[in-house]
Amino acid sequence: MAVAVEITRSEVLRPSETLAAGGGGKRSQLTVFDRAAMDWYIPAVFAWDGAAAPSNDEVKGGLAAVLARYPHLAGRFDVDERGRRCFNLNNAGVRVLEATVAADLADALAHDVAAHVNELYPKADMENADEPVFQVQLTRYACGGLVIGTACNHQVSDGQSMSFFYVAWAAAVRSAGATLPTPFVDRAAIAVPRGPPAPAFDHRNIEFKGEHSWTHSYGSLPLERIRNLAVHFPDEFVAGLKSHVGARCSTFQCLLAHAWKKITAARDLSPEEYTQVRVAVNCRGRASPAVPMDYFGNMVLWAFPRMRVRDLLSSSYAAVVGVIRNAVARVDEQYIQSFVDFGEVAAGDELTPTAAPPGTVFCPDLEVDSWLGFRFHDLDFGRGPPCAFLPPDVPVEGLLIFVPSCAAKGGVEMFMALDDVHVEAFRQICYSMD
């Protein structure tokens, strides 16, 4: 049964004037980290049952209050006098849609999520020069349940920034605007080049699509061949994985090692072929000096653990975790400073991020992102945390996202996309530690 989503209201919500701490039409340059992020809107969709759902007015009131501390979200993209893209911190506001569904949320979550999740967040008009960079949709169900779907341009912020923002938004609703954060928003201060700048790595082809970029080698598939899957790993399974590793490791490291092994086996690749994972690395604590964890913007680079297929499949979990850990460790303060220096050298150049377009096939490789640090239970608007995180379609084969489970018993959800021909083989082995 298809669920009809009816848009009932559309407005532009501006920050609370009495609380605004920044903006006022100032311009802010994109950092080289922003330029490396995809110029695309990233959706996030959360659901609250009727007992925990706040009213629309409460949600909008808290949003107006918290936007006063996040001027980039309330601003617009602009072009400076040198023709470079920049932020205009003009407090122009965010788009807010309100919608209704003539069905109960529990029924929709049980039967129709995949069929209508992409109707639960706003669709940005990429051709509109004045398009809000952050957009919200509040969808109310017949039972009183609420789904909040957002879409934010990735060049504005990374996942860590948005997780801090969502928690701050919830706190603003709970406190009726009395509890507001003071995030670090000075982009110029987090990417200071040396004098003279001295990039030491080939960033034009690693983080951007230069002439010799690794992204040029990937093929594509019709979107109907790319299957989206959700795999739940209970806490007990994660604990068993860590025990299987036999050495100290993080939840992310052991789950990535497991997923890399099982997906590679399901793909039935040649033993002599190489496979690598593009791992998003938060650089805030790795930079020198360190950048505050509440910095709002992009501060992500990528690590590339790589193994021959036969070695990956025959190696112990501890060995694979070691390969992942060593690759991530190479994204150190020297590498980060080199990237910042490259940004200065290439400030006037046209740079294209290595983001994969829909239909891209990463096989034999993977790309992984982690929201495991996102405290979903802190996303409490006053009556309780969300009952579900709803994954939108992932249109890129080989992309994995780890998210903490909203289930009462905890655990981790892995949202992923695979070529349909490999799905059944993966399902048969995804919980095996052999």
Curated annotation (Swiss-Prot):
EC numbers for this chain: 2.3.1.-
Keywords, comma-separated and alphabetical: Acyltransferase, Transferase
UniProt-annotated catalytic positions: 154, 380
Record's keyword annotation contains DNA damage: no
Major enzyme class: transferase
GO MF assignments: acyltransferase activity, transferring groups other than amino-acyl groups; hydroxycinnamoyltransferase activity
Name assigned to this protein: Tryptamine hydroxycinnamoyltransferase 2
Keyword Signal attributed: no
